[in-house]
C-alpha cells in the first residue's frame, strides 16, 4: 500500500478512482492494484455501510414508517394488563422516547445530545411489573431477557457476573450484537441489592452495594465484552462487543419497608410524649398512596446508592391490586387465565365456564394469600386438577361449570354431558 507522498517523489500526479480528486485535494490517497481511493471516499463508504447495517437490524416495529405512539403503546398494554394506569402511561412515554432516540441517533441536528432514560418500577409482589416489561418487548418485537438481582455478585466472586445479563440477551437473538443493542432487559428484585445501611460500607458487600457499583456502567452505557456462545473468557478468545447505551434497562422490586421511610419523611408534627402525632387507623395512608410521594432521598435511605438512582431517572409506582382488579385480571385480558384454561378444555371438546361468584372467590383467596395476581394460577391449578385428570377419560362431556362452592372446596365441578345429563365429577 502506498500514499500520496511516495508518488509525489516519482513526479506523477495521482487521482482518486472514485471521486476524481487529485492527491493535492485530499489528505490521503491509498493505492491498490491500478486503482486509488481517497480518505473522503473511505469515510463516505463507511457511513453508507453503517446506515445499511442500521436499517437491517431494526425490528419490524422500528423499520416501519412510524414508531408506535405512546397512546398506541398504552392501548396495547391495556389489552394485557389490568389497572396501573399511571405506570402504563409513564412506561409508554419512556419507551417511545428511548426508541425514538435510537432511530434518530444520540445527537439532534442542533447538536443536542439525547440522554438515556432507564426505568425503575416500584410495586408489591404480583402487581404486574414483570408482565408490563414482557408485554412491551413483545409489542415492539425486540429481544427481551430477565435477570434476578439476587443472583448477581461482583466480578471475581461466586455468583453471576453482571455481564451475564448481556450474554442472556445475546442468546435471545442468536448472538447478534446489533439486535441485542435494541433489546429490553428487566432486572427483578432490585431492592434486594440495597446496602445494609445508608452510609457507605467500609467492608466488602459483594451482593449489595458491590452489585450496584458493577451495574452502574452497564446500565448507563458501556461497551460490554461478552464471550460468544457462552464460552468462558480467556485471552485468545474473540469477544462480542455490545453497546449497552442502546439497551433499555427496566429495574423492578417490591421495596418492602420503603413505605415506612416515606411515611417518616412526610409525617408532620412528629414528637414524643404529649407532642406526639397521634393517628387513627382510618387515617393511615395506604402503601400505594405513600409510594406516589417517593423521592430519590427515600431510595437512598432504603439502601440504593445515589449514583445508581441517577441511572434510573424514570421512576413509577404500581399499586396493590384489590379484589375487583383481580376479578378483572381473571377474565378480561386477551390472555386471561380463564381464557387459557378454557382453551385447554376446548381441546378436549368441552366448554369451561366460571360463574361470577367463582371469580370473586378466587380473587378473595389470592388477597388472603397476599400474592397478588401471581397467586391466581396456582389457585386455578388446584381447583381444576381433578377435572383435568378425569376429563380425557370421560366421553360426552360438553361443559364444565365452576362456581363458588367448588373454589371453597365444598363441592365438585359440575359436568354437563351431551345428552344434557348433569352430575358432579368424582374421583374413580
Curated annotation (Swiss-Prot):
One of its GO terms (cellular component) is HslUV protease complex. Keywords: ATP-binding, Chaperone, Metal-binding, Nucleotide-binding, Zinc. Zn(2+) binds at residues 16, 19, 38, 41. The keyword Nucleotide-binding applies. It comes from the Bacteria. InterPro entries: AAA+_ATPase (IPR003593), ATP-dep_Clp_protease_ClpX (IPR050052), ATPase_AAA_core (IPR003959), Clp_ATPase_C (IPR019489), Clp_protease_ATP-bd_su_ClpX (IPR004487), ClpX_bact (IPR046425), P-loop_NTPase (IPR027417), Znf_CppX_C4 (IPR010603). GO terms for molecular function: ATP binding; ATP hydrolysis activity; ATP-dependent protein folding chaperone; protein dimerization activity; unfolded protein binding; zinc ion binding. GO terms for biological process: cell division; proteolysis involved in protein catabolic process. The keyword Zinc applies. ATP binds at residues 124-131. Residues 4-57 form the ClpX-type ZB domain. HAMAP family: ClpX. ATP-dependent specificity component of the Clp protease. It directs the protease to specific substrates. Can perform chaperone functions in the absence of ClpP. Belongs to the ClpX chaperone family. Component of the ClpX-ClpP complex. Forms a hexameric ring that, in the presence of ATP, binds to fourteen ClpP subunits assembled into a disk-like structure with a central cavity, resembling the structure of eukaryotic proteasomes. This is ATP-dependent Clp protease ATP-binding subunit ClpX.
